[in-house]
């Protein structure tokens, strides 16, 4: 489609050498003005497409960020003045007539890359100026391409886009909800959706077969680099499917999104179970861009005389090559003491370290407590060589894994947007994770509607914490993009799971009746997934903070500066029951 409008013939960034001699009209903002002698001035004219140089009469009054309309002739730049850094750098606009469409006050910060160094709260206060910059224009357009690609990918797989309600009953999904008071019923509240989870399952009961939505969700959680009160996700649900069907459909959308953002197909999406991810990487969000995999050293120390290891349920080890973190070797014991303190902060009782000397011998205060066979077996199990550092945590299995997993990231993890893209599906999560200390009941791993793994159903009553779920997460560069599961479609099985959570049949009817009752009318087997578009776009755009890919994000401290956060409401505007 042409960019021509009633006010312009071209966009600023469109002009090329092939346009030389053409008379064109452009509209945009004055990015920079440079005087050239007494009678000429160069204006860099900018719009969302790029920048072009315009040669104007020196008497023309046009300053930074003024909105102007320029009509001129496309000409080649004189020899020696071509700007290879601009797409329009071979040409300029000469014989220009300029019309001022709107004057502007001097901006509070440069509308270019220099604004990256400006305090973020200032950028957010003047977000409408910040978004004029090339970086922000690029990010928002990447986001638009990703959304379009996702819609196309889902539609071609016969998914139907359906909008679900924003006002819904309050349900316990794990995070704090935003509540909206009812005007009709005093003391009653709607909740803004943390996800369309319940609605999309009802759509499967309704026979829609395949649903999707690019949904706005809201959770009253603390803000951080990868979290906002409001976030956008691809939400999808499918009937008559198994795990592989859901993963294939979502993978297709992810590949389409990555291709739209980067122009290239992403690498194949890897697969591993939750147990494997924890064992090898110490986290259910493994970053596969670098090594330092964990090793199970428990068999190495079976029957050991070393008391710290003898009483431990599990012993995990990690080899840190000298080249991976040379400052550890350079700073010696002080750096190792810091690692030990960090391990304790993460919940470990302590950290055992051993260095491999030039002769292959293990050097450590604890080395003398290990037998020759144990030292040799440890070196063999980890593949350690001269100059390497071995870190070991002996504790409960989950503690040993997570502590070493975090140390792994502390030592070697690159920024999330750097390096290759490493996608991985993590499957077979636990149905329940730990026990709620207040109730003594298990806590749901993902949410209460995940279907138990068929192979583990017989263990549901006797060993609920050992039951796997048909649940899965998609992880990119150590960031969880989203999660999903095959859902419980049998009412009685759903009630069994609720009972484990301490939700009685009566309580379930009261809290989830609007959701459970339709399942009595023939709910099909179904499953789905949701992934965060903000996080995906941030990584694909090379950003380490999702605020950089959201037009008007929120921060903890921006209420007074932006006027776009919460505000006080007068008593007269408060809702009252009718």
Residue ranges and their predicted role:
Residues 1-563, 570:
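Class II aminoacyl-tRNA synthetase catalytic cores and aaRS-like
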């Amino acid at each position: 489609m042409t960019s021509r409008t009633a006010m312009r013939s071209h966009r600023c960034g469109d002009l090329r050498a092939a346009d030389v001699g053409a008379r064109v009209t452009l509209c945009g903002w004055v990015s920079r003005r440079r005087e050239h002698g007494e009678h000429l001035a160069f204006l860099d004219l900018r719009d969302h497409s790029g920048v072009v140089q315009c040669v104007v009469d020196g008497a023309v009054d046009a300053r930074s960020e003024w909105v102007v309309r320029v009509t001129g002739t496309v000409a080649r730049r004189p020899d020696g003045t071509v700007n290879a850094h601009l797409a329009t750098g071979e040409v300029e606009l000469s014989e220009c007539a300029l019309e001022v469409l709107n004057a502007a006050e001097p901006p509070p910060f440069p509308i270019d890359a220099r604004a990256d160094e400006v305090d973020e709260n200032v950028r957010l206060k003047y977000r409408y100026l910040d978004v004029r910059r090339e970086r922000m224009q690029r990010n928002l357009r990447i986001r638009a391409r990703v959304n379009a690609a996702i819609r196309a990918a889902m539609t071609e797989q016969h998914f139907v886009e359906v909008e679900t309600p924003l006002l819904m009953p309050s349900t316990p999904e794990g995070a704090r909800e935003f509540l909206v008071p009812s005007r009709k019923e005093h003391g009653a509240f709607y909740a803004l959706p943390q996800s369309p989870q319940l609605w999309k399952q009802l759509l499967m009961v309704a026979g829609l077969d395949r649903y999707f939505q690019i949904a706005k969700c809201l959770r009253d959680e603390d803000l951080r680099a990868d979290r906002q009160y409001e976030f956008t996700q691809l939400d999808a649900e499918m009937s008559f499917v198994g795990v592989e069907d859901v993963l294939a459909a979502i993978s297709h959308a992810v590949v389409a999104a990555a291709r739209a953002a980067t122009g290239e197909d992403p690498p194949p999406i890897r697969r591993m179970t939750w147990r494997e991810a924890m064992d090898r990487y110490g986290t259910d969000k493994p970053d596969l861009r670098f090594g330092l995999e964990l090793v199970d050293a428990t068999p190495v120390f079976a029957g050991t005389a070393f008391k710290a290891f003898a009483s431990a349920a599990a012993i995990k080890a990690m080899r840190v090559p000298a080249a991976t973190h040379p400052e550890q070797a350079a700073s010696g014991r002080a750096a190792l003491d810091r690692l030990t303190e960090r391990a304790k902060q993460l919940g470990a009782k302590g950290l055992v370290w051993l260095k491999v000397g030039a002769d292959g011998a293990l050097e450590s205060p604890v080395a003398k407590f290990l037998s020759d066979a144990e030292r040799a077996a440890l070196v063999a199990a980890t593949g350690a060589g001269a100059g390497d550092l071995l870190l070991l945590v002996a504790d409960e299995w989950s503690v040993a894994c997570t502590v070493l997993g975090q140390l792994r990231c502390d030592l070697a993890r690159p920024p999330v947007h750097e390096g290759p893209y490493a996608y991985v599906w993590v499957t077979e999560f636990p149905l329940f994770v730990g026990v709620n200390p207040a109730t003594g009941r298990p806590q749901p791993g993902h949410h209460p509607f995940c279907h138990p793994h068929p192979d583990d159903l017989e263990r549901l009553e006797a060993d609920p914490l050992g039951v796997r779920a048909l649940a899965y997460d998609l992880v990119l560069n150590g960031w969880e993009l989203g999660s999903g599961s095959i859902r419980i479609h049998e009412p009685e099985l759903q009630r069994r799971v609720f009972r484990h959570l301490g939700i009685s049949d009566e309580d379930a009817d009261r809290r989830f009746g609007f959701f459970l009752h339709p399942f009595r009318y023939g709910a099909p087997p179904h499953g789905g997934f949701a992934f965060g578009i903000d996080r995906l776009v941030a990584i694909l755009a090379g950003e380490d903070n999702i605020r950089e890919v959201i037009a008007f994000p929120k921060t903890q401290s921006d209420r007074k500066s932006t006027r776009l956060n919460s505000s006080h409401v007068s008593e007269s505007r408060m809702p009252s029951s009718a």
